[in-house]
Amino acid sequence: MRHRKSGRQLNRNSSHRQAMFRNMASSLVRHEIIKTTVAKAKELRRVVEPLITLAKSDSVANRRLAFARTRDAEVVGKLFTELGPRYQERPGGYTRILKCGLRAGDKAPMAYIELVGRPEAAQAVEVEAAE
């Protein structure tokens, strides 16, 4: 029985899932909008929102925590220099999920996940996880 177990398995083992969400979080921070499946977008929200909350208070300890979770120095820099100050007054809810139909190959429900208040120049990037 799976009573009270949170999180989706997404047909992956735990290390694959962790690596996939680490990569997707880095892509979302870098591009500010990505296209993925609805289930992955909903799970990605649980990874990215705490990172942005962490970036709202800049300290060496918080930067090290963010680096431990993303393993990407460029992403950590953007989190603390751009995104943290941008969302300083917002108490959570930094992402938006917009459903965009079904994928052509397997009819999987697709969605854009984007950062709220992003510059309009940012273009969507498709993220395809290893399947």
Swiss-Prot record:
The keyword Glycosyltransferase does not apply. GO terms for molecular function: structural constituent of ribosome. Gene3D superfamilies: Ribosomal protein L17. GO terms for cellular component: cytosolic large ribosomal subunit. Keywords: Ribonucleoprotein, Ribosomal protein. GO terms for biological process: translation. InterPro entries: Ribosomal_bL17, Ribosomal_bL17_CS, Ribosomal_bL17_sf. Part of the 50S ribosomal subunit. Contacts protein L32. Belongs to the bacterial ribosomal protein bL17 family. This is Large ribosomal subunit protein bL17. It comes from Shewanella sp. (strain ANA-3). The lineage of its organism: Bacteria, Pseudomonadati, Pseudomonadota, Gammaproteobacteria, Alteromonadales.
